[in-house]
Amino acid sequence: MKLLLVCGGQSTEHAVSRMSCVNIYKNADKTKYDVKVAGITKEGEWYDLVSTDFSSDNWLEGATKITDHFTFLKSFDVVFPVLHGQFGEDGTIQGLLEMAQIPYVGCRVMASCTAMDKIYAKKLFDQANIPQVPSLYVKKRYDDKLVVVDDEGRESFNVEMEIYTHLGFPCFVKASRSGSSVGCYKVNSLTELLPRLHEAANYDRHVVVEKAINATELECAVIGNDDISASRVGQILPHGEFYTYESKYEDEQSATCIPAKVDQSIQDYIRQAAVKAFKAVDGTGLARCDFFYDNDTGNVYLNEINTMPGFTNISMYPQLMKDAGLDTPALIDELIKLALQR
């Protein structure tokens, strides 16, 4: 079977994608799959890669530029888009593969784009009665002014007062369509707020502002198409105030714990809520569902779901699936099987 891995991409998570691809390529069973890799540069150019060290600076050495994308893609039996963030996890690459009529790993177009957009995902999760941390939607208009937008689309220019009144400080400012904690900032005071909002808006003109809670970060992996299975719950042990990009991929002092150090009843609730959230976006294939456990109140909140979670050797999704009995080679087999079933 001819398997194509696609990595890189134009998002801020370009480097993470390449690290994930290294791990998937290493673990894909070469007796089952003829594995090739296409790399997408930050400028959006596609290359047929020769080097297998996709995370190195020389990853394009010896590569051939791909100009006829459809013809190239249609030469494969299945595609694994190992792409995170915009132009990869947001339904765009999925739409291209749908048009080319090629089976691919992961969620389809609508689930991908909805889950990637924190603002619209929150609306769906509200409809599914899944608790979430109190939040506000801030938009940077095309005239560069910031406004708070309510559920009926009404705009308020009193951004600082709205956030201070409804959420208070500290709070978190998050670019709506960014992942791996890129464009995510903790704001401790009113004087920090506007600069951080503008910084987040550099990644996405749509921004979510959430109330900060004294939280333990918990994660659950789901897998399946019609029949969804959920892993045990894992716990993030960040080296710092919250799980930043650096904590996830660069800080060796950050750690994970499986199972999480919370009551079994909390873990059972999270596993059920993870499946519910995955179904709410009509997910297929896989996702990592992220939750907050409020240490002060005991409440559990859904943070977000990631439809193409990190696959590095330290990423939580493959760790959770290994704990569930699927090591990375077997996990790749199962994800490809699910892709071919659709």
List PLM regions with ranges:
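Hydrophobic beta-strand scaffold residues
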Residues: 35, 103-104, 132, 171, ...
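Active-site "cap" helix and flanking loop/linker of ATP-utilizing ligase/carboxylase catalytic domains
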Residues: 235-287, 319-342
